[in-house]
């Protein structure tokens, strides 16, 4: 079988699996976040944290819950790393340095999972399981909760109440993430992913000498790493490591886990707003962008430029033979168009244009289909902008789902869109202008600039993947990337929740003959165009200096 055909068949199998899961999981999520009943274990959790799950919150109270919970998570994870040297199950690893502990705590709480450390050489069992794995669950649940709050803003009228953050958080963990992760972990273990608490083993090599291998609770962390679009690997090689991702089947299964909840949430959006077709319009836009990026990436990496690449079947540098170009390209596009950041190949080794595609996927805002929760609310904000643009073109007040998009709403949407590019470009410019950050660059020229641009794009968009040529374990990068991750995660949430509160207070406007039909393919095309044009205008100069210059020079 040719590598191209193998890649196409994987794409078709993945699409079929997602299509089968879309309706039942989307319906289930709608029931979870609409049910007035609480499970017994949920009641125990509410009692233990002193929360009243039946109290409705306005957007400032909802935001305070998000920020307070996340701040507590940062402090706990920071202290856990700083105390690792005296904790049991540390495997003899020392405590983490302050700047790296801050970076890692910010990274995992912000659902970014940027890693400036070698997982198997720095983190013991306690930090991995009680710290990092726990944040993989709760940070994903926070993202879903904020997305559901925005959906309620569209669905509700004449009220400022958006639900209860603590109830949404707990339900996301207990009813959604834990059950799916439990089943997924069993599947991964059955396919060869390790799950144990063994120590460090010294093994012999075929060519002589010895090598140290770590055990660990890898399968349980691997599944939520993908399902929660987190991305932080147990091992430094991430999902390229055979202990995390041993076969082509596990590779495809992990891609399925990454896309599962973001795709299903579009169905949940349609059900909760009373129009399933609106959900399909959003899903269609996401799917079209994702499919276009996959096709472009495969074409770029399969393109033959000389006899060596032709003999290898394409650009195989940095890719695992067991996955090939098809599986690697599919994973790379999926992980950067969502907020996952896990890798089964090394993006720095992709062709110049291939690396640019991964970077552009993050620059879009990771909304196709995006991260768990963050993808949906990011695309809905872009839908508000697209409706506003359409209203300007026809000269009537823009409306979306029966809600008027006025000055207040478009200001919130504009602030949401501007915050991430500002972080990316300001931090990148500072790193390039100052002498110290440049010492961390392995490469010079266009590729060296791409390493810096990729790092801040990844951090600010809460992705976490990296161009491996950059040494990010320095005080400058640990501090600035950590700050970018926190600001890139929580400042946009402020505007999302403010937008939700503004929409929820409105009275529905009845549709008329002149109302834009936002469930039609025409609007989906307008939405996709708005996403691509806004991103292109914002980032094109930076992309021209980095991946485009490198790709065109090749």
Swiss-Prot record:
GO terms for biological process: potassium ion transmembrane transport. It holds the Pfam family KdpA. GO terms for molecular function: P-type potassium transmembrane transporter activity; potassium ion binding. Disulfide bonds: none annotated. GO terms for cellular component: plasma membrane. Keywords: Cell membrane, Ion transport, Membrane, Potassium, Potassium transport, Transmembrane, Transmembrane helix, Transport. It comes from the Bacteria. The system is composed of three essential subunits: KdpA, KdpB and KdpC. It is found in: Cell membrane. The chain crosses the membrane at residues 3-23, 60-80, 131-151, 174-194, 252-272, 279-299, 323-343, 352-372, 375-395, 412-432, 481-501, 522-542. The gene is kdpA. InterPro entries: KdpA. Its main location: membrane. The lineage of its organism: Bacteria, Bacillati, Actinomycetota, Actinomycetes, Kitasatosporales. It is a multi-pass membrane protein. The keyword Electron transport does not apply. This is Potassium-transporting ATPase potassium-binding subunit. It comes from Streptomyces coelicolor (strain ATCC BAA-471 / A3(2) / M145). Belongs to the KdpA family. Part of the high-affinity ATP-driven potassium transport (or Kdp) system, which catalyzes the hydrolysis of ATP coupled with the electrogenic transport of potassium into the cytoplasm. This subunit binds the extracellular potassium ions and delivers the ions to the membrane domain of KdpB through an intramembrane tunnel.
